[in-house]
């Protein structure tokens, strides 16, 4: 039996647009167990593609991330290297955004990239995804949306 993804009450509230209908609705679930056919699990890793821990390990174990591949589409996942510094991470996010723009048939579920083992705050990482928010096929964690919309 396939396990269902888990949304918190707050995530479900945002997904309706909130009381005023103005909150972003493209929210990822807190826990991702499964992906639809067109969904891609977006995670942070290192440039060497050593997917030891965190979302990188989940991507490797569950969604086809390739050992030794530090960036790009791999199976049902997309790796963004985050361990090599803010400047290189920002460039990798730009490449991801361009890839998502070129593949509107895919739905990208962006985890809190860079906010785990890489050690960045949401205040540092979320603005890197500002251009991606213009794409209907990119879904972000609620923590990123809160920074981006000032909530």
PLM regions: where:
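Macrodomain-like recognition of ADP-ribose-binding/processing modules
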Residues: 1-151
